[in-house]
Amino acid sequence: NYNIGVDFEPQKSVSHSLLSDAPEDQLERSVMNFSPTVNFRYKFSKRTRLQIVYRGKGKQPNIRDLQPVTDRTNPLNIRVGNPSLKPSYMNTFTLNFNSYNTKYQRNMVATALFENTINNVTNQVTYDSETGVRTTSPVNMNGNWRAMGSFSLNTPFKNRNWIFRTYSYLQYRNQNGYTTLNKEEPVKTSVQHLTGRERLRITYRTRQMELTGLVGLTYNNSYNDVREKRTETFDYQAGTELQLYLPWGMELYNDLTYFLRTGYGYEGYAKANFMWNCQLSKAFLKRKQLLIRFKIYDILHQDISMIRTITATAIRDTDYNALGSYFMVHAILRLNMMGK
C-alpha cells in the first residue's frame, strides 16, 4: 500500500534591528512552507517487508542570518547577515528492507538514503592574512548532497549458543562553500567526504554467562578541491564483553575495548587507549520491577574525548577534557499502568 500527503505551513517573521549609530531597521517576511510525503510499503511475507519513502521539506533562513547587521562581538570573527537569502528545500529518499527468518532466528536489515538540498544556506568566509580577521556571511548554494547505505545481519550458528552479528555502513557526502583570501573574488570550495564503517561481533551464550568478542574499523577520506589535499584516518577497535548471571539474581557485566587511531594531525588523539567499564545489578520486588545498578566508568583513566568536524572550508579537531573515572548508581522502577 502507499500514502501520499502534503503539509502547508504559513510562516511570518518580523525582525527589528536597533543600532546606536543607525535608524531602526525592520525586516518582515511572509512565506508558505511546502512539505510533500510519499510512503510506499510492500509486504513480501509476514516477516519480509520493503518501504520506500520520499519527503520534501522547505526551510526558511533564521532571523540572525537575515538581519543586515555586522556582529563584531568577536573582533577576529566578524559575522555579517544577508537579507537576500532564499528559502532552502530538502529532498530525502529512503529505502528500508527488513527480513526475519523464524526457523533460523536470522534478522537482516538494509537501508539506503539519498538527500540533496536546493538553495542550501552556507557560509562565505573572507580571511585577511594581515590582520587575522575572518568575516563570515551566509549565502545560498546548490550542490550539497549525500548518499548512505547500511546493512546489518544477526544470526545464530548451527549451535544456537553461538551468535554472529555484523553491521556495515557507507556514506558519501559532497559539501560546497565559498572562501576568499585577502578580499579577492570568492572561490567555490568543494569537499568530498567518504565514510566507511564495519563492526563484527561473535557471542557465546549459556545459562550462566555471555561472552562477546568484537572488532571494528572506521575509515574516513576527505578531499578538498581548492587545496587539492586529501586526508585519511583509520579508527580501529577490538574488545570483549562478559556478562555473568550470579546467584541471588545478581548480574556482573564488564566491557573492555582497545582503540587505535591513525592519520590524525593532532598527536594527543592519534594514540592507543583502553576503555574499561564494569557494572553490578540486581532486581528486586516480586516481579523484579525494581532494578538497582552500580556502574564504574573508565576504570583505567584512559578516555580520550575528541570530535572531528568536516565542512566545505575547514577540518576542525576539537579536544574536550574527559570526565575521568567515575561511578553512578541507578534505580529503575518499571510500572505497568495497563493492568494484567
Where are each of the predicted segments found?
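Exposed, low-structure sequence patches enriched in small/polar residues
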Residues: 1-340
